[in-house]
């Protein structure tokens, strides 16, 4: 073994962290010290001496031993770190942390004497799965509901409706009420911030306002005044109003009703690019069916991924967790920016710290799911062929032909990741048992209604025919 060779002892620590205890020979320490002296003598400027011609004794006196030792140690630690990575075939996730700190190590560093230092770093974890086949998962079923077609058409009719004044009857559900109002809290009589208006349009539909407000307007006559009791929900957006009772003095100034357009071809042409009402209905039905299939598939895949993640054994490195947390916070900031908000003034250091803390559980769960899929791909040797990736890249590139600043390498990686994820989830679906569950609220809307009391479940073995799980769980939920 060379006199300057490094001896390394590796210790695995929690959270996928490695501690590398490195024994640096005395000759190596002395050589680094001498190199530091030479380097400083060439670069330092001292009065009365030409650059690079400063005598060693003068240099030591002017700079001091501590600075020279510190310079030597810095270069030594950096060189040792790079050499250890290559020698031990380690791929770190972050820069090394010197155990005990630099100052403590500097005190023990003496040229001509051996030195032991400990470097710590996070490394990519090795995820393992206790099982990959025969997993049990439960997924909520999503089926096409024909009544949604009528709901969408009615929404369009409302948007295209003509508002007609009402004078001869009281306010009713579905009307548009123009009101003035002022509100106070019942507990202390204080005015509600933002709780007054001289004129506001109120759509008299359930859920449009806080509980009690719309209900109080129903039955009022034009020009009348009424005090209405309301209750702010516990999850109301303004914290100081949550759960509090309030009273509003309401004046009904105007009342309007919607005059809906006839359901005919003219309506279809006005509300869409379809020529006839039949074409509009067929288009809406097709889109809703496709959406139901997508959501149903997404539910199954989410359930399978959750079941797979339960089989995962892994130590999450803090470096990856922090990276995922930053991604989540950046996504939140991007969403606010897209809504036109001033992100720079909104995202104070305090808010960022709070968001990072609250985002940690989600970040860890996302990491666990990603690592579970990675482990599945390795365990079952599932890959995507280059030809598949290239074909998909061409398809996506055509769709993004008008976009600028597209990084081909990043696009290819994103396409590859998506294709592999789909393949892994399809494999899971073929090798797992999914219990499909229809919630009571959805069962009531399925046909025939009389046969859909309570929750219904059906166990579907998706081992031989994947297409079977693309269908509703039971004929009773078909429409």
UniProtKB/Swiss-Prot annotation:
MF terms in GO: peptidyl-prolyl cis-trans isomerase activity; protein folding chaperone; ribosome binding
Comp. bias intervals (Basic and acidic residues): 467-479
CC per GO annotation: cytoplasm
Catalytic activity: [protein]-peptidylproline (omega=180) = [protein]-peptidylproline (omega=0)
Record remark: domains: Consists of 3 domains; the N-terminus binds the ribosome, the middle domain has PPIase activity, while the C-terminus has intrinsic chaperone activity on its own.
Family: Belongs to the FKBP-type PPIase family. Tig subfamily.
Record function comment: Involved in protein export. Acts as a chaperone by maintaining the newly synthesized protein in an open conformation. Functions as a peptidyl-prolyl cis-trans isomerase.
The protein's name: Trigger factor
Gene: tig
